UniProtKB/Swiss-Prot annotation:
Its EC number is 6.1.1.15. Gene3D superfamilies: Anticodon-binding domain (3.40.50.800), Bira Bifunctional Protein, Domain 2 (3.30.930.10). NCBIfam families: PRK09194.1, proS_fam_II. Belongs to the class-II aminoacyl-tRNA synthetase family. ProS type 1 subfamily. Consists of three domains: the N-terminal catalytic domain, the editing domain and the C-terminal anticodon-binding domain. The keyword Nucleotide-binding applies. It comes from the Bacteria. GO terms for biological process: prolyl-tRNA aminoacylation. It comes from Vibrio atlanticus (strain LGP32). It holds the Pfam family tRNA-synt_2b. Homodimer. CDD domains: ProRS-INS (cd04334), ProRS_anticodon_short (cd00861), ProRS_core_prok (cd00779). This is Proline--tRNA ligase.
């Protein structure tokens, strides 16, 4: 490709609204342009990378035995009503009506559509197992699109759906897709980890996320220091403490704390150790309990894990905190003065809270706290659950080592759905005994456009992007110095360009009338792995200059061996 025929569109300055490095570099390298909030046009350079990700994913998913189809982006709303997800998805599900007032949605995912397809096309166990996938545009009406294509409203996604006659078959399909994901991300040159995950709105019995490790990641990943255990912090279990509850050493005392409305203020002003305090949070209860509000109690230095709380049957889903007005109407005090003593509401305590003694908590009166609280003596402990986020140094749930935390960007997710959708949509076949069997489903997604941004988060320097070879928009750049003034430079560049392209090597030939410095900066910014510089001075010595983008190394290469050198670098 000649730059004279190409839309390179690089920018010198970083746009003000670009927060993370991938967004900044995708704009500066001319990969994308913003059309509206969360909506982007993919320019030629970005599209070349996107297609490379798609092709690697397609090859590995094909190798796993899946079959490609293409489903509509526009879906009938009635399918979403069949599964009950029309409300569960909330405002992220963009709804509209056509000219005949028929309701539709823009596809955020395709479980309903593919299940509808299979129930009409498959009738016998002999047609199974079946795994169907597509690479298609998706739309989710994000409340706050940010980080460029990392969290956009419109995005490219590979979504696959497996159908099996039984759970054993589902597990085989699931493992095959897990392995295909690993092969795809390995080929892309990404540092990633598969981690245990919560199934969220998709549902099902088990799932794993695939995270590209990056400091800018929105998710925290918990790892064991001594095993392969890894889980999203939403899923990572905080084990019950092994120590016994210590005997009381203090009497419970009501203390005036007029200026302590937070745990931090309580600790600072009254000299308590933060691990000797608890915070009490009021949340909306589900229909499982008679009360409208239920209290959750966690240690003062721990954070409530909202996903764990939401998964408890007593808690309304989605999790909703009680307002200050609701709290005051119930106990007559504000959120900073709540505690378990004398509380006439059901409450659930975290495992770490259950072994505390001589601790401090709000007295359910503004400006007052109880110190020296002990379970049994001062307040009865009823229900205990895992409510908190794990922290570094916790024992690993696998029983080996301790927890370490790193940030990750979710680029893939696989689910064992079971019969959640097939049962709701009456998707069944005749089994070997002639009886009707509800199919077992799996679903699998890779955020193709998000992979592009994630790769940049892992592969960049102060000059621009340092693509892994498999994802680079071009393999080789040719930079001819002053070719419009030097005929022999032009001839050498044209000859090399013709030879490389004839070999199927992807080349960007910078034939612009630009200063060499501008050309070099653009090539570095875009991140082309291998550059050949052709100039009169080096040609006088019978050489071209080779530069490796990732290492920055430069070397003189004999003109008649440059192709062999490049072939070795690209091997």
């Amino acid at each position: 490709m000649r730059t004279s025929n190409y839309l390179l569109s690089t920018l010198k300055e970083t746009p003000n609204d670009a927060e993370v490095i991938s967004h900044q570099l995708m704009l500066r390298a001319g990969m994308i342009r913003k059309l509206a909030s969360g909506l982007y046009t993919w320019l030629p350079t970005g599209l070349r990378v996107l297609r490379k990700v798609e092709n690697i994913v397609r090859q590995e998913i094909d190798n796993a035995g899946a079959v490609e189809i293409l489903m509509p982006v526009v879906q009938p709303f009635e399918l979403w009503e069949e599964t009950g997800r029309s409300e569960k998805m909330g405002p992220e599900l963009l709804r509209f009506t056509d000219r005949h007032s028929r309701p539709f949605v823009l596809s955020p995912t395709a479980e309903e559509v593919v299940t509808s397809l299979v129930r009409n096309e498959i009738s016998s166990y002999k047609q199974l197992p079946l795994n169907l996938y597509q690479i298609q545009t998706k739309f989710r009406d994000e409340r706050r699109p940010r980080f460029g294509v990392m969290r956009a409203r419109e995005f490219s996604m590979m979504d696959a759906y497996s159908f099996d006659i039984d759970k054993e078959g589902l597990e085989k399909s699931y493992q095959a897709m897990h392995d295909a994901y690993c092969k795809a991300f390995d080929r892309m040159g990404l540092e990633y980890r598969p981690v245990l995950a919560d199934s969220g709105a998709i549902g099902g019995s088990g799932s794993q996320e695939f995270h590209v490790l990056a400091e800018s990641g929105e998710d925290l990943i918990a790892f064991s220091s001594e095993s392969d255990y890894a889980a999203n912090i939403e899923k990572a279990e905080a084990l019950a403490p092994t120590e016994e509850v210590a005997a009381p050493t203090q009497e419970m005392e009501l203390v005036d704390t007029p200026n302590a409305k937070t745990i931090a203020e309580l600790v600072e002003q009254h000299g308590l150790a933060i691990e000797k305090t608890v915070k009490t949070l009021f949340v909306k209860a589900s229909d499982e309990v008679e009360a409208d509000i239920i209290a959750l109690i966690v240690r003062g230095d721990h954070e409530l894990n909202e996903v764990k709380a939401e998964n408890l049957p007593q808690i309304a889903s989605p999790l909703e905190m009680a307002s200050e007005e609701e709290i005051r109407a119930l106990v007559g005090a504000g959120p900073g003065s709540l505690g378990p003593v004398g509380l006439e509401l059901p409450f659930i305590a975290d495992r770490s809270v259950a072994v505390m003694s001589d601790f401090g908590a709000g007295a359910n009166v503004d400006g007052k706290h109880y110190f020296g609280i002990n379970w049994g003596r001062d307040v009865e402990l009823a229900q205990v659950e895992d409510l908190r986020n794990v922290v570094e140094g916790d024992l690993s749930p696998c029983g080996q080592g301790t927890i370490q935390l790193k940030r990750g960007i979710e680029v893939g997710h696989i689910f064992q759905l079971g019969n959640t959708y097939s049962k709701a949509m009456n998707c069944n076949v005749l089994g070997p005994d002639g009886k009707s069997v509800i199919l077992e489903m799996g679903c699998y997604g890779i955020g193709v456009s998000r992979v592009v941004a994630s790769a940049i988060e892992q592969n960049h320097d102060k000059f621009g992007i340092t693509w892994p070879d498999a994802l680079a928009p071009f393999q080789v750049a040719i930079v001819p110095m002053n070719m419009h003034k030097s005929e022999r430079v032009k001839e050498a560049a044209e000859k090399l360009y013709a030879e490389l392209t004839a070999m199927g090597i992807e080349v960007l030939f910078d034939d612009r009338k630009e200063r060499p410095g501008v050309m070099f900066k653009d090539i570095e910014l875009v991140g082309i792995p291998h550059t050949i510089v052709i100039g009169d001075r080096s040609m006088d010595e019978g050489n071209f200059e080779y530069k490796n983008r990732r290492t920055g190394d430069k070397e003189a290469i004999a003109m008649d061996t440059v192709i062999e050198h490049l072939k070795a670098q690209l091997a």
